[in-house]
Amino acid sequence: MASELPMSPHLEQIHGEIRDHFRALANGFQRLDKIKDSSRQSKQLEELAEKMRDCKRLVKEFDRELKDGEARNSPQVNKQLNDEKQSMIKELNSYVALRKTYLNTLGNKKVELFDTGAGVSGEPTAEENVQMASTMSNQELVDAGMKRMDETDQAIERSKQVVHQTLEVGTQTASNLKGQTDQMGRVVNDLDTIQFSLKKASQLVKEIGRQVATDKCIMAFLFLIVCGVIAIIIVKIVNPNNKDIRDIPGLAPPAQSRKLLYFRE
């Protein structure tokens, strides 16, 4: 059994993690058979693909540790460990092929929903994939599985780059919008200040207008008084014997004409 192989503690830890991933993959594919909704099946397949990528990373790490410890192990132990590595790679590739089969089956179901019967799809069916996998050698399965995983990793990296670029554009747009929002806030504050200044100026103009109107009324009243006094003076001068008009205080009455008296001898 694999657990009885002589391994270093770190190599044994990696081996245990790989086996845990294999059990999780087996359980995941069992649950996948019970799922009827295509969208949920797609989501489950994505989760299984993520576990396969982790498993592939662990297998590579297992291979590196194995190569680093070859000098410390006997040829027989190295052969057993290499056989275990090939067994894990083959098991991983079987899950990769199984996922591909489910993807093709799911794709065929979607095509059947929209197919008009005019043509035939060129994609291999699930049965063809199983037959193809059964005719391939272990090394061919390993190479095909690694190639498929590399293609998946490249697609994920491209998706990550697109997401990163989208985030950069979104961040730049948000920064520009924030700057424009701050500028609009300053403009609104300036408009409020101008409006307040205009209100104060309007109130000041009204106050000055009221003061000017009051001064004009006073000047007009004084002008009427002066005109009245002048009119009375003129009347007194023209008709000094008019008793209907009282004497103006401070104004001396007009001098009476003097008559010269002379005596006859």
Swiss-Prot record:
Expressed in roots, stems, flower, siliques and leaves. It comes from the Eukaryota. SUPFAM superfamilies: SNARE fusion complex. It is a single-pass type IV membrane protein. Residues 239-265 are vesicular. Residues 32-106 form a coiled coil. It is found in: Membrane. Keywords: Coiled coil, Membrane, Phosphoprotein, Protein transport, Transmembrane, Transmembrane helix, Transport. GO terms for molecular function: SNAP receptor activity. Its main location: membrane. Residues 146-208 form the t-SNARE coiled-coil homology domain. The chain crosses the membrane at residues 218-238. GO terms for cellular component: plasma membrane; plasmodesma; SNARE complex. The keyword Chaperone does not apply. PROSITE patterns: T_SNARE (PS50192). The modification Phosphoserine is found at residue 74. One of its GO terms (biological process) is protein transport. Residues 1-217 are cytoplasmic. Belongs to the novel plant SNARE family. Vesicle trafficking protein that functions in the secretory pathway. This is Novel plant SNARE 12. It comes from Arabidopsis thaliana (Mouse-ear cress). The gene is NPSN12.
